[in-house]
């Protein structure tokens, strides 16, 4: 058995595995393997010339904390039935996470089929999505303020324009280009769907991608530059009232539809956990993000008697990671530069935390016990999962401490003094 990146000679085996494990149409499988699949970014378990398991590491860029960062979006997690329950996927996932680190990427994302499974690999929910269901006649009152046009490949630039404007207020959104939207148009058509752009005074100001599922108008995504454009989209949806009785709209948590329809009580607004994230390299992740925390440069202009309480804080945090042993250990977090940073206490500590529970230390026992005795006091213990939700801005330190049944200390509040962010992403592969 071998775990490695696949090659073009094994494309059919990877494709056969995908076809067996996922209920996608033949047309969609053709689309995916033509446009999205990259053998050099696909990890497999191969045995005797057969592909038993695979994980696809699809490459994306996210705008996270205002930074343009590369990441791997883990999709296509699959195993042939005869190889299930043998531990192949655990080994493959572990190896894949290390390979992501080797790409110089400090985090990964994944849309889970089961949150429990992926939490055991160090992933944590960092994105939710809002699903709105309502009677299509709830949208009757809205007015059109321009015209709609079905998107073709030539309008990919207009889609980029609308999308880039719409995500400016979100955290963690994927960065998309003309190639992405050309593929989205093709994907929607393959799935029996449509992509329409709304123009006002000749300028693109909104778009929606949707399918008509029986009598339900299902919006996969909608983005807009202003509320007037959104209301025109809602009127566009209503104009399908002879075909559809209901509408389902997938959108961001800050959607204002509840505020503008006349009777929101009869509609449903459901928050659904959507995307998980995973920190690959904790120290690098913080360097990549450059999260502003603490007083920063303003401390230098304070009176000397005030400066000691304004020059930043530090805490010691014990971090546990079930897969990437290099993340295990005790870190000193500080914000004295105005930017949140973390530094681990020595490689020996990392080695100690990476040891299996029943490891026999032999001659090393004495030095390791001395090292343990020299360790700093710990302010809090956090899992790599909890740190992902915190550093993505999905939860605050007060949230995490409350869930853990403890009170956040003043030092923790001073270190993690940033607020929750509105995280929104709507990528499927």
Name each model feature, range by range.
Residues 1-59, 66-73, 140-179, 213-218:
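Short amphipathic alpha-helix that is part of the acyltransferase structural core
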Residues 12, 147-429:
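Intrinsically disordered, low-complexity, positively biased terminal segments
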Residues 40-44, 54, 76, 193-197, ...:
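Short hydrophobic/aromatic beta-strand element in the GNAT-like acyltransferase core
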Residues 77-79, 222:
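Hydrophobic adenine-recognition pocket in adenosine-nucleotide-binding enzymes
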Residues 79, 85-98, 227-238:
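Conserved acetyl-CoA-binding loop-helix of GNAT-fold acetyltransferases
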Residues 93, 98-112, 242-252:
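Conserved GNAT acetyl-CoA-binding A-motif
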Residues 102-106, 112-130, 254-271:
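Conserved active-site alpha-helix within GNAT-family acetyltransferase domains
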Residues 125-141:
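Flexible glycine-/small-residue-enriched beta->alpha junction loops
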